[in-house]
């Protein structure tokens, strides 16, 4: 996702404590372009989410998201940076493109040591299905689809601002 972020230009990136740990684990923590504004999870109330109420955002991309984050979002629990941002985006009618990690009964995923087989639980797959029913939220099932939806959104916004 970092390479994709770096191609987008003027974007804000919210990095949760868990995401920061993962970036370090995968040795990607210093690869985000200096042009990107980064907000880190350093307060309980996530003050930076106030920008949603100032109409500064038109799109939220949540990628990649763990099964834990998906479950919390589906059930309205907003107790972390990621889940709070999703809740605020929904309340402010900000379009969301959501990329959950657990999207199929069997997956190959990249771990720090290489690819591993993963078998998401039934509850995780059910939560992804529920997420697909959320209004103004597009749930994508692959990185390729994520790229396509972001490109489509950018093109749509270009046309609407003409």
Where in this protein do the model-derived segments appear?
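A cross-family phosphate/adenosyl-ligand binding-site feature
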Residues: 1-162
């Amino acid at each position: 996702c970092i390479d994709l972020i770096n191609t987008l230009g003027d974007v804000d990136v919210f990095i949760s404590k868990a995401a920061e740990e993962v970036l370090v684990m995968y040795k990607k923590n210093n690869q985000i372009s200096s042009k990107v504004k980064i907000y880190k999870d350093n307060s309980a109330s996530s003050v930076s989410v106030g920008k949603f109420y100032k109409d500064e955002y038109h799109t939220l991309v949540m990628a990649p998201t763990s099964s834990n984050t998906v479950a919390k979002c589906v059930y309205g629990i907003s107790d972390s940076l990621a889940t709070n941002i999703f809740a605020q985006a929904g309340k402010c009618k900000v379009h969301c493109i959501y990329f959950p990690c657990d999207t199929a009964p069997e997956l190959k995923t990249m771990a720090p040591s290489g690819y591993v087989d993963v078998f998401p639980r039934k509850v995780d797959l059910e939560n992804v299905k529920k997420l697909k029913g959320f209004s103004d939220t597009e749930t994508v099932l692959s990185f390729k689809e994520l790229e396509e939806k972001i490109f489509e959104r950018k093109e749509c916004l270009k046309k609407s601002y003409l």
